[in-house]
Design a protein with these regions (language model features):
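Solvent-exposed loop and beta-edge segments used for protein-protein assembly and interaction
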Residues: 76-80, 107-109, 147-151, 190-192, ...
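Short, solvent-exposed beta-alpha or beta-beta edge segments that form flexible loop/patches at the rim
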Residues: 44-83, 137-142
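Short beta-strand and beta-hairpin "edge-sheet" elements
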Residues: 114-164, 294-295, 303
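Short, acidic/charged, Gly/Pro-enriched secondary-structure junctions
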Residues: 87-134
Length: 303
C-alpha cells in the first residue's frame, strides 16, 4: 500500500544461499515510509536520486569525408545509472554496524538486486541493478566506537537494461469458435515495443497472423503432452518444443529461414489471435490447455 501520496522506493537484495537453501534477499524501505519503518530496516535515502528519468540515447550518424551534414542511421539506448546518497541508521553503534553489514551483504559482486518504485497511480516497476564501482567510498570522520549513524554515504546502482520492468503478465487465449483463440488485454508499457512469449499446447497445429506486410506463420503439429514456446524478442528469438519427459527440441531449423516478428503496442489494448489448423490426432481432438501469451511490461521512466 502506498503511504499517503508519496513515492515508495525499496531495494530488494538478490537471492542468496544460507548454507541449506536459497532464501530471498532482504528488503530496505528507502523512502516514502514512516520513519519508524525505515529505522527498522536501517537504511534510508539521504537526498534525491539522479538518473531516474528518461534514458540517455546515443545517436549514430554517418558522415562523409569533406561533406557537410550526415545521416542518422541508428539510435542506441544503453545502460542506466542511478546515483544518490544514503543514511545508515540505528539506535546504538552495534545496531548501526548490523545494518551496515546487512546493506553490503545484499549487494554481492555481480549479483543483481531490484530497485523498486511504487506510486499510487502507476504500475509498480523496478530496475535490475548492481552497485556502481564507487558505491560506499567515503571518509567517515566520526569515531567508529561511537558511530550511531552513517550520513550521506555516496551510493549508486547500474542496470545493463535502460528501462524499468513491471510484473510479468500472462493472458490465456480463449476459444471463440472456428478454431480461433483470442486474447484482448491492455499493455501499460511506455517503451515503443514489447516482445512477448507465446506458449502453444500439445494436440494441434497452429497458425499466427504476423500483421501487416507479413505472411502467416504455421507451427508443426505439437504432440499431446508437449508445449511449444516462441519468443519474439530479436535479441533472443527462440522456437523450442518441450516434450512430456522434459526434453527440448530447437525447431528453427525446420522453419526454412522464416522468423516471425511480433511486438505489442504500448499504452493501448492489444488483440492477439492464433488459429488451430488441424488436430495432431484426429481420434483425440483436444488440446492440453489454452494457448498463452506472456510478457514483461517495460517503462521509460520511474513514473
Amino acid at each position: 500500500m502506498v503511504w499517503k501520496d508519496s513515492v515508495m522506493v525499496v531495494y530488494q537484495g538478490p537471492p542468496r544461499w544460507d548454507g541449506n537453501k536459497w532464501i530471498n534477499g532482504d528488503h530496505f524501505r528507502l523512502s516514502g515510509f514512516p520513519r519508524g519503518e525505515r529505522l527498522q530496516d536501517g537504511v534510508e535515502l539521504a537526498r534525491g536520486l539522479s538518473g531516474l528519468d528518461r534514458s540517455t540515447d546515443e545517436y549514430r550518424i554517418d558522415t562523409g569525408a569533406n561533406t557537410p551534414g550526415g545521416d542518422l542511421v541508428a539510435v542506441s539506448t544503453g545502460r542506466r545509472e542511478v546515483s544518490g546518497q544514503i543514511n545508515i541508521l540505528g539506535s546504538s553503534p552495534a545496531e548501526v554496524r548490523k545494518h551496515y553489514r546487512s546493506w553490503w551483504r545484499n549487494h554481492p559482486e555481480k549479483e543483481k538486486g531490484r530497485l523498486w518504485f511504487y506510486t499510487r497511480e502507476g504500475e509498480p516497476r523496478y530496475l535490475s541493478v548492481v552497485k556502481t564501482e564507487g558505491a560506499g567510498l567515503f571518509t567517515n570522520e566520526q569515531d567508529p566506537a561511537l558511530l550511531n549513524r552513517v550520513t550521506s554515504m555516496p551510493w549508486g546502482w547500474v542496470s545493463d537494461h535502460p528501462y524499468f520492468f513491471g510484473f510479468r503478465t500472462s493472458h490465456d487465449l480463449r476459444h471463440t469458435g472456428d478454431g480461433h483463440f483470442n486474447a484482448v488485454f491492455y499493455n501499460p508499457s511506455t517503451v515503443p515495443e514489447i516482445y512477448p512469449d507465446l506458449y502453444l499446447p500439445g494436440g494441434g497445429k497452429f497458425q499466427l497472423s504476423l500483421g501487416y506486410g507479413q505472411p502467416y506463420f504455421q507451427t508443426r503439429p505439437i504432440p499431446r503432452g508437449s508445449t511449444a514456446k516462441i519468443s519474439f524478442d530479436p535479441r533472443k528469438r527462440t522456437y523450442v518444443e518441450k516434450d512430456s519427459r522434459g526434453n527440448y527440441t530447437n525447431l528453427w531449423p525446420l522453419m526454412l529461414g522464416r522468423r516471425p516478428k511480433i511486438s505489442l503496442e504500448p499504452e493501448t489494448l492489444n488483440k492477439f489471435t492464433v488459429t488451430l489448423m488441424e488436430w495432431t490426432n484426429n481420434n483425440d481432438q483436444r488440446l492440453d490447455s489454452d494457448p498463452r501469451i506472456v510478457y514483461t511490461p517495460e517503462f521509460m521512466s520511474w513514473v
